[in-house]
Amino acid sequence: MTSLTRPRVEFISTILQTVLNMGLLSLGLILVVFLGKETVHLADVLFAPEQTSKYELVEGLVVYFLYFEFIALIVKYFQSGFHFPLRYFVYIGITAIVRLIIVDHKSPLDVLIYSAAILLLVITLWLCNSKRLKRE
């Protein structure tokens, strides 16, 4: 087995980084399209006369924020020199669990467990934003 030379390792790293960047750029564009579709869907739900449309509107808003947060995560990745900040994943996790509570709130025990998960994520966010762990 031959060992890789430094220039060859850097070349492979550059190729893989380019593939990753192109994939994330493609994902970002797809998410922008979905964000546009969700905007149209929210406008339809907003003017729907049914009573159930209120829950659908709130669920749609949370899904909208999930798309928005994923797009913001991709933008931050490129702005911060190809690095994903941990706190953005925590924001996405909190929003996703809030959406889950809104959609599936039949079992009080499940809602309590989801709420505990949100509390754990908020504590994680607090720790990530503390002076010792903050990178930016």
Curated annotation (Swiss-Prot):
It is found in: Cell inner membrane. Keywords: Cell inner membrane, Cell membrane, Membrane, Transmembrane, Transmembrane helix. It is a multi-pass membrane protein. The keyword Metal-binding does not apply. It comes from the Bacteria. The keyword rRNA-binding does not apply. GO terms for biological process: cellular response to phosphate starvation. GO terms for cellular component: plasma membrane. The chain crosses the membrane at residues 15-35, 55-75, 82-102, 108-128. InterPro entries: P_starv_induced_PsiE, P_starv_induced_PsiE-like. Belongs to the PsiE family. PANTHER family: PROTEIN PSIE. This is Protein PsiE homolog. It comes from Enterobacter sp. (strain 638).
